[in-house]
């Protein structure tokens, strides 16, 4: 594995154990308005916008937009205060930072829903940037978030690694022209990532961090 100057990571299901929180918020938000949606479909959509997930769950475009607009404030406090990082992530981020690698998070979430869990875990000091919808207009799988960090830091795209757990994450890296590392803490398996052409695949973010640091050592 080559040495990278910057690593950008997805948040949900990559470094943060949020599968149940997101699924439950999507479901209970819709239930407030009389919808009984398939939890499996909601869970499989994690990584996309709430509007896209509600569309996949069978809502009309107007219904999906309404539920999306209600979901944002409904879920905000829950995500800020109940999100926890996966085991080993804190140590992994510390190790990467100690190696001089610039670290950033790219997510569809508002930045405070990311910074607060990072602060609670004591790892916010390792993160250079959180790239949220506040920073870029076009979201994953569009490459704008990765371009934003490259332009902000002056780090070339060939020196950036993007890490994620989903097909959307892989498409984002491909669209940006950066290397991609898959972690299998989401819905996509290692075999599925390999079939799609992923070359760097690890069970967890912590495993990936250990592999990167071992290469530098």
Predicted features and spans:
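Substrate-recognition/cap helix-loop segment adjacent to the acidic, metal-dependent catalytic center
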Residues: 30-33, 52-61, 82, 97-104, ...
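Short acidic capping loops at alpha-helix termini that bridge into adjacent secondary structure
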Residues: 37-41, 62-63, 124-129, 157-161
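Acidic, Mg2+-coordinating phosphoryl-transfer loop and its flanking beta/alpha structural elements
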Residues: 161-200
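Structural recognition of alpha->loop->beta junctions
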Residues: 122-132, 192-209
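Conserved Lys-Pro-Asp/Glu-containing loop-to-beta segment of HAD-superfamily phosphomonoesterases
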Residues: 6, 140-170
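N-terminal helical cap/lid subdomain that shapes the substrate entry/recognition surface
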Residues: 2-90, 95-99, 115
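Glycine-rich phosphate-binding loop signature in dinucleotide/nucleotide-binding domains
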Residues: 1-2, 98-101, 153-159, 215-216
């Amino acid at each position: 594995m080559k040495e990278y100057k910057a690593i950008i990571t997805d948040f949900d299901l990559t470094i943060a154990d949020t599968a149940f929180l997101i699924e439950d918020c999507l479901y209970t938000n819709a239930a407030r308005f009389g919808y009984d949606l398939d939890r499996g479909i909601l869970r499989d959509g994690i990584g996309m916008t709430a509007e896209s997930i509600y569309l996949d769950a069978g809502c009309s475009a107007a219904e999906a937009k309404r539920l999306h607009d209600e979901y944002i404030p409904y879920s905000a406090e829950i995500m800020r205060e109940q999100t926890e990082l996966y085991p080993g992530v804190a140590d992994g981020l510390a190790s990467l930072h100690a190696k001089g690698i610039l670290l950033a998070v790219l997510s569809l979430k508002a930045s405070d829903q990311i910074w607060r869990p990072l602060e609670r875990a004591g790892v916010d000091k390792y993160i250079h940037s959180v790239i949220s919808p506040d920073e870029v207009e076009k979201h994953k799988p569009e490459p704008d978030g990765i371009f934003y960090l490259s332009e902000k830091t002056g780090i070339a795209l060939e020196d950036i690694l993007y890490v994620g757990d989903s097909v959307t994450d892989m498409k984002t890296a491909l669209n940006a022209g950066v290397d991609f590392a898959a972690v299998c803490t989401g819905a996509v398996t290692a075999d599925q990532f390999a079939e799609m052409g992923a070359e760097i695949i690890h069970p967890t973010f912590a495993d990936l961090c250990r592999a990167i640091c071992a290469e530098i050592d």
